[in-house]
Amino acid sequence: MKIWVYAIAKNEEQFCERFMASCAGADGVSVLDTGSTDGTVEQLRELGAHVESREIAPWRFDTARNESLKLVPEDVDVCICLDLDEVLAPGWREALEAAWTPGTTRGRYLYVWSHDANGGDGVTFYADKIHSRHGYHWRCPVHEVLMTDAPEVQRVIPGLRIDHWPDSRKSRASYLPLLELAVREDPDNDRNMHYLGREYMFYRHWGEAVETLMRHLALPTATWDAERAASMRYIARCCEALGDTRSAAHWLVRAAEEAPTQREAPYELTRLYYGMEQWALCRYWAMRTLHITERDNNYMTDPAAWGSGPYDYKAVAEWHLGLYDEALDAARAALALEPDNQRLQNNVDIIRRSNNAQ
């Protein structure tokens, strides 16, 4: 089996060595450089990659991806689309060869999009940018997707993992105009409508965000419960930012009903009522959050909902309500998840003293 990695790059010199080391085992690496002014091109070539330079104007990620795919030799069996800030975990080739049975056209694998402060997994989901050489192309100006007009045979690839270690200083300023372009090109695309609404929220354009996210929810193709619930949560964040906590709570309750197996909406309700010092409601939604024990692997998962936060909020709410035994249990559970957190240790001590004072 001939396996090839292909990528696009611009001014990513700091990632070259790590990127190429993780690609060890590939039959080749092709990179389309789109205008680096640092040493990216030279370093990649020194490390063994085939690199070509080309200006993409006007800039679109799908055009760049399609041009980079053209660099992959025609006789390759399997292509891996990888960015310079991504890392293939050791053993990837063996895992891929074991799972790629005859007739397979596309592979799904664990993608770790973010990491916590200690390097542990943050947001994780299954990605699908491993594909057969022929019959595929990229579409959408940003948040591009891999498309095919032919029948697909997909396989999950156990043991294949890609970690994303981005440069937090890198600008994403091009995303908003490209998302606006994507929606103009295909106004019925629910995925892009959701992304555009989220991007407006990131930019604190609250009114435009709410309007766009409402458009997403109204699209007949917007049926994925997790993504619909995320749009509702983002609407709630906009409402809260505008000082309308009543509407924020309304939309978060709707989100919790839309995706009852997801922790994120009840966790945000917990946080909302904590900020409002409505302790009974804060405790109720913390308990609702903790009742959900199976975590989905989708890109909208919030790691905070699966950390110490739900127990922490529950402990504080119960302390205010005079439920000291329950508060102490919750505070200890929070501390067990973050044993080096001094504030959580202080909370345990405060609640223990309150309990002893009864």
Feature-to-residue mapping (PLM):
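Short, well-formed alpha-helical segments that are part of the catalytic scaffolds
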Residues: 7-26
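Acidic helix N-cap motif at the loop->helix transition within catalytic regions
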Residues: 14-17, 38-47, 91
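Active-site nucleotide-sugar/metal-binding loop of Leloir-type enzymes
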Residues: 66-78
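A conserved acidic beta->alpha catalytic loop
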Residues: 22, 32-45, 56-57, 83-86
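Catalytic-site signature of metal-activated, phosphate-bearing donor transferases
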Residues: 62-69, 88-211, 215
